[in-house]
């Protein structure tokens, strides 16, 4: 999410959300 480009920013957010969900499911 560091890049100013909106597409990159959005993809970074999606990746971070998926990673957080994975951590949550792992307890």
Curated annotation (Swiss-Prot):
The keyword Secreted applies. GO terms for molecular function: toxin activity. It is found in: Secreted. This is Killer toxin KT395. It comes from the Eukaryota. Keywords: Secreted, Toxin. It comes from Pichia kluyveri (Yeast). Its main location: secreted. The lineage of its organism: Eukaryota, Fungi, Dikarya, Ascomycota, Saccharomycotina. GO terms for cellular component: extracellular region.
């Amino acid at each position: 999410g560091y890049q100013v480009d909106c597409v990159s920013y959005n993809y970074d957010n999606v990746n971070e959300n998926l990673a957080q969900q994975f951590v949550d499911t792992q307890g």
